[in-house]
Amino acid sequence: MRVDGRKCNQIRPVKITRNYTKYAEGSVLIENGDTKVICTASIEDKVPPFLKGRGEGWITCEYNMIPRATQVRKARDINRGRIDGRTMEIQRIIGRALRSVVDLRAIGEKTIWVDCDVIQADGGTRTASISGAFVALVDAVNKLHKQNPFTIYPIRDFVSAVSVGIVNDTRMLDLCYLEDSRAKVDMNVVMTDSGEFVEIQGTGEQNPFTREDLKELLALAEKGIKSMISAQKDSLKMDSLWIGTGGE
C-alpha cells in the first residue's frame, strides 16, 4: 500500500479546469493529486529571429514555482539573478513535448508562449505541466482556428506525461513527493495518444536498473498516460474533435 492508499499502477486523481484565467488565449488549472499547476498559452504575431521569413511558427515554454509551492520557501529566480538548471531543463522538455505534436508550418509565423506556474508541488510538476499545457495549447489554437481557419489544423495528436519509479523495490506509477524522494529509480515519460514516445528521462538514483525494470516501468507509464489523455479528452470534450484530422 502506498502513502496515499493507491495501488502501484494507479495515477493520482486528475482534475483539469479550463478557462482558468481571464486574458490568455488558453488557460488551465491542472490538479494531479496535491500537485497544482496553472498553465496558460498566449499567442504572439511574430517569431524568434532564427525563424523569420521561413513561414513557420514556434512554441516555447517558461516554467516557474511560486515561492511557497514547496514545503520550504524557495526564492524566486529573479532574486537569485539566474534561472536554475532544473527550471531550464523543465522548460525545454515542456516545449519539446508540445512541439512534437504540432505542425509548426500550419501555424504560420506566430509564437505560442506557454507559461506553467506551479502553485503547489507534491511530485510530478513537470509531467503535470505537460499534460495541462497541452489542453491550454488546444484552446489557444482553437481560438485562432475559429477566427481564421487553418488550411491544415496544426495539432496532430494528444501528448501527455507521467512519472514512474522504483520505491522500496516496487515499481510505481505517478510518484508523489515522498515516493520520489525515496525512489531508487526515477523516470519521466512523455507519450502521444498513438503510443509513440516523445521523451524518456530515466535515472538510477541509488542503484542501476535492469532492462526488465525499464520494460515494466515503460508499461506502467503507458498505462498512466492513457489515463492522463482520457482526462484531457474529458476536459476538452467537443473541442478536441479537430485533433489529428488536419482540419478536415
UniProtKB/Swiss-Prot annotation:
InterPro entries cross-referenced by the UniProt entry: ExoRNase_PH_dom1, ExoRNase_PH_dom2, ExoRNase_PH_dom2_sf, PNPase/RNase_PH_dom_sf, Ribosomal_Su5_D2-typ_SF, RNase_PH, RNase_PH_bac-type, RNase_PH_CS
Molecular function GO labels: 3'-5'-RNA exonuclease activity; tRNA binding; tRNA nucleotidyltransferase activity
UniProt-annotated binding residues for phosphate: R86, G124, T125, R126
Stretches assigned to coiled coil: none
Gene3D superfamilies hit by this protein: GHMP Kinase, N-terminal domain
SUPFAM superfamilies, A to Z: Ribonuclease PH domain 2-like, Ribosomal protein S5 domain 2-like
UniProt keyword terms in alphabetical order: Nucleotidyltransferase, RNA-binding, rRNA processing, Transferase, tRNA processing, tRNA-binding
Reactions it catalyzes: tRNA(n+1) + phosphate = tRNA(n) + a ribonucleoside 5'-diphosphate
E.C. number(s) listed in UniProt: 2.7.7.56
Enzyme class, broadest EC rank: transferase
Gene Ontology BP annotations: rRNA catabolic process; rRNA processing; tRNA processing
Matches recorded under NCBIfam families: RNasePH
Family label: Belongs to the RNase PH family.
Functional summary from the UniProt entry: Phosphorolytic 3'-5' exoribonuclease that plays an important role in tRNA 3'-end maturation. Removes nucleotide residues following the 3'-CCA terminus of tRNAs; can also add nucleotides to the ends of RNA molecules by using nucleoside diphosphates as substrates, but this may not be physiologically important. Probably plays a role in initiation of 16S rRNA degradation (leading to ribosome degradation) during starvation.
Subunit note: Homohexameric ring arranged as a trimer of dimers.
Protein name, per record: Ribonuclease PH
Origin species: Clostridium kluyveri (strain ATCC 8527 / DSM 555 / NBRC 12016 / NCIMB 10680 / K1)
